């Protein structure tokens, strides 16, 4: 793909929308566009890693291997989001993996050193980036607090409410819908439960007319009712 087309693609996203041609070249992104087939790992057991990744298309599964040798998902990264060494610290991904999930994905990568130079040069970009990282860290903190203080049903309703707040998808005749990139097992891993428990509770939410859940999409049929469940807990 010509570099002009690559630059146009990345400039479609808020974080990068004001990049100059010179800024773009400083990141060396044109040398690091990557197409990753579904199921392949972008990195695995990343002990010496100095890259940040930006998702142009698709979903990335971030996880780790537990003591029993099982893969555990801790985050699903979507189009327009960053992953990797997003705190700009080297070697803080011990035991973490990143895997192309659901479909083939398109990402770009750049070195921490190049990005830090650009942040020093462009304080407006540094501010936007710090806000994005801050929001990401708050999400992680809230998830941890929920794990410590909430029961499974409350954690599940908070998880779905988080999806509503992200305002993904479009308003559909049957309600607000988002593309579904999650299996019951993924949700179980993300909120600290079992697949069987999550399946039972999703069935209850469907019976109550709050949402519908299938492989293609999640539809929130009664947002006010879901919000009430979240506010009560």
What annotation goes with each model-predicted range?
Residues 39, 50-63, 79-80:
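Glycine- and acidic-residue-biased ligand/ion/polar-headgroup-sensing regions
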Residues 165-233:
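Phosphate-/nucleic-acid-contacting segments
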Residues 1-38, 82, 87-88:
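Cyclic nucleotide-binding regulatory module and flanking cytosolic helices
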Residues 42-47:
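Short phosphate-coordinating micro-motif centered on Lys-Gly-acidic
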Residues 67-74:
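Short alpha-helix-to-loop micro-motif enriched in aromatics/charged/Gly
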Residues 124-190:
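Polybasic "coupling" helices that flank or enter modular domains
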